[in-house]
Amino acid sequence: MDRRTLRMKTLLLGATGQIGNAFAEQLPSHWDIISLGKKELDLRNADNIPSTVFKFEPELIINCAAFTEVDLAEKKKNECSAINHIAVHELAKTSKALGARLVHFSTDYVFDGCQALAYSEQSPTGPLSHYGQTKLDGENSISDTGCEFLIFRTSWVFAKNGKNFIGKIDKLLRDRDEISVVNDQFGAPTSASFIAKIVLLSLLRSNLSNGIYHLSSAGATSWLGLAQKYLALCLNESAENRQYKCRKIIGIPSSEYQTA
């Protein structure tokens, strides 16, 4: 039977985040949807996951919850591991027990960034940060359980809500005459709305088997290139009467970037 005719019982986790909010806006209205944010299910405490998930008996679990602040992850390693690895493993085990399918989101930070060409799903992983390592650990823990799963590795996610590079840059562009942005890291800026749209199309068409898939927009740029493009677009949108002080963006290497 076509999934579009079913009342798919779906548990959406991380519903208030960037990707979660995009799913909340796009999930089919005829599906039976339960949306949980951090207040309803805090993934820092994995012991609560089985009882909470079993209570709803979902057929599909979409996990959009994650610890995503790369720099902060180095200072909060236990919390990052708890959310990105331990909780994900518990979700996968619970999905297996329920016979539910788990949709999970990972990142291009599972790679070391040294490859000149675009990474494929078969490319060797080699995370350089604690954040990247926890996301890779989460991937492996899902596949190890034998549950039904789809893992999507995304890149430089942005949305109108939530914490992301665009939001941070917007504030800096308003407040400062000149800013410095890293120019030697490259990725594919990808909107949360696009991610939700493609994943839902795949679910509705039932055309993906268990596995890991790369999902991002076409092309690539640096953080510097993205900041410059954003400023140019904002300066052209005079109708919104935005006030930006910044007129100069300087490119710097990652080695000169100072974290807060």
Residue ranges and their predicted role:
Residues A46-H85:
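NAD(P)H-binding glycine-rich loop region in Rossmannoid oxidoreductase-like domains
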Residues F67-V70, K75, D108-L128:
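Active-site "gating" loop of Rossmann-like NAD(P)-dependent oxidoreductase/epimerase domains
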